Curated annotation (Swiss-Prot):
Disulfide bonds: none
CDD domains referenced in this protein's UniProt entry, alphabetically: Ribosomal_uS17
Gene Ontology MF terms: rRNA binding; structural constituent of ribosome
Keywords for the protein's UniProt record, in alphabetical order: Ribonucleoprotein, Ribosomal protein, RNA-binding, rRNA-binding
Protein name, UniProt field: Small ribosomal subunit protein uS17
Any single GO BP term: translation
Family: Belongs to the universal ribosomal protein uS17 family.
Function: One of the primary rRNA binding proteins, it binds specifically to the 5'-end of 16S ribosomal RNA.
Quaternary structure, from the entry: Part of the 30S ribosomal subunit.
Length: 85
């Protein structure tokens, strides 16, 4: 059997849990501005599969890349690192 390539793993915060078995995760990165050389925070959102509807808004979660599960879902929740208070 051929080995599978490394899958991307990201850590982010759940910003929406209104969908069934799906959460929206916001991931914040900082990158250097090409002209001004200042570090700028950028936030991007992705939809992740949450099989048991365990995640709530504010949870810190680890997501892993997976096969396409729907039109926009290509990530799944691996673990909940920290629960929201």
């Amino acid at each position: 059997m051929a080995e599978r390539g490394l899958r991307k793993v990201r850590v982010g915060k759940v910003t929406s849990d209104k969908m069934d078995k799906t959460v929206v995760v916001s991931i914040e990165t900082s990158e250097k501005h090409p002209l001004y050389k200042k570090f700028v925070k950028r936030t991007y959102k992705l939809k992740a599969h949450d099989e048991n509807n365990e995640c709530k808004i504010g949870d810190i979660v680890k997501v892993m890349e997976t096969r396409p599960l729907s039109k926009e879902k290509r990530w799944r929740v691996v673990e909940i690192i920290e629960r929201a208070r």
